[in-house]
């Protein structure tokens, strides 16, 4: 399975999965149709699947247009997003499996950013060294999504599930927010050497127009404050020992950063 990162809108990423043997493709969270159609044309591939993580317009905006071009494709989304995702036919819940070509993925129910958010995890297969996590707006490189419909307790539970995946899991998040996320993280953990080094690397990468997605879960666990709510450094910075309260305060600070 090959993965293509397609920039869209101002800071979105659409991910196109390609099975070269069958010459079929799937897209994750298509914000707009043009990047997808251009990539499909270059590959000469047929789009058979849309995997949506949640209902927001910058994640489902191209669904209708892509269905018009490929009327036999299937749209997947969360069970609790019923009626909110255009063209949705498959309604997924925690522990369900999805198939793309010869790859089988697991569905995680990860409410927080929205009440119905899901993520798709494809574990390593064969000689591949990394698993692939398509997490929408749940984890960002260096951050996490705002809590529009969910609670801090829900998000802590959701991130706990994803944090338990192997460190070599690639994090395919849907926005290029990394530099600003790490600027905020440094206000919380200014003495974190791993974070300092990552910020320097990302600053250079972005100045040269390079993407910072995907990242690796192992790096996120060392540098992303929203995966470190239960470390003493973050607890001390937030003035609490209660994980949910710590996370809520952390998210509140980021909302106003």
UniProtKB/Swiss-Prot annotation:
Sites where the protein binds Zn(2+) 2: 58-59, 137, 175
Annotated HAMAP family: Glyoxalase_2
Pathway: Secondary metabolite metabolism; methylglyoxal degradation; (R)-lactate from methylglyoxal: step 2/2
Protein name as it appears in the record: Hydroxyacylglutathione hydrolase
UniProt cross-references to Gene3D superfamilies, sorted A to Z: Ribonuclease Z/Hydroxyacylglutathione hydrolase-like (3.60.15.10)
The keyword DNA-binding appears for this protein: no
UniProt organism field: Gloeothece citriformis (strain PCC 7424) (Cyanothece sp. (strain PCC 7424))
Keywords: Hydrolase, Metal-binding, Zinc
Cofactor: Zn(2+)
Cited Pfam families: HAGH_C (PF16123), Lactamase_B (PF00753)
Superkingdom of origin: Bacteria
Subunit and interaction comment: Monomer.
Gene Ontology molecular function: hydroxyacylglutathione hydrolase activity; metal ion binding
Similarity remark: Belongs to the metallo-beta-lactamase superfamily. Glyoxalase II family.
Cofactor note: Binds 2 Zn(2+) ions per subunit.
Catalysis: reaction(s): an S-(2-hydroxyacyl)glutathione + H2O = a 2-hydroxy carboxylate + glutathione + H(+)
């Amino acid at each position: 399975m090959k993965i293509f990162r397609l920039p869209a809108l101002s800071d979105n990423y659409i991910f196109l999965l390609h099975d070269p043997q069958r010459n079929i493709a799937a897209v994750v969270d298509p914000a707009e149709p043009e990047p997808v159609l251009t990539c499909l044309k270059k590959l000469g591939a047929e789009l058979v699947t849309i995997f949506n993580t949640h209902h927001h317009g910058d994640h489902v905006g191209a669904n209708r247009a892509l269905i018009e071009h490929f009327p036999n494709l299937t749209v997947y989304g969360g069970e609790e997003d019923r009626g909110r995702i255009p063209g949705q036919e498959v309604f997924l819940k925690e522990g369900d499996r999805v198939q793309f070509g010869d790859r089988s993925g697991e569905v995680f129910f990860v409410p927080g950013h929205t009440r119905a958010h899901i993520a798709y995890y494809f574990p390593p297969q064969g000689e591949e060294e990394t698993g692939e996590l398509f997490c929408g707006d749940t984890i960002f490189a260096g951050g996490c999504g705002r809590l529009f419909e969910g609670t801090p307790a829900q998000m802590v539970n959701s991130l706990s599930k994803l944090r338990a995946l192997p460190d070599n899991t690639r994090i395919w998040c849907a926005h290029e927010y990394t530099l600003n996320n790490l600027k905020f993280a440094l206000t919380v953990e200014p003495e974190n050497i791993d974070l300092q080094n990552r910020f320097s690397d990302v600053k250079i990468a972005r100045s040269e127009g390079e993407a910072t997605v995907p990242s690796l879960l192992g790096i996120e666990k060392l540098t992303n404050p929203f995966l470190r709510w239960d470390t003493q450094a973050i607890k001390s910075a937030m003035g609490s020992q209660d994980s949910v309260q710590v996370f809520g305060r952390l998210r509140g600070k980021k909302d106003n950063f």
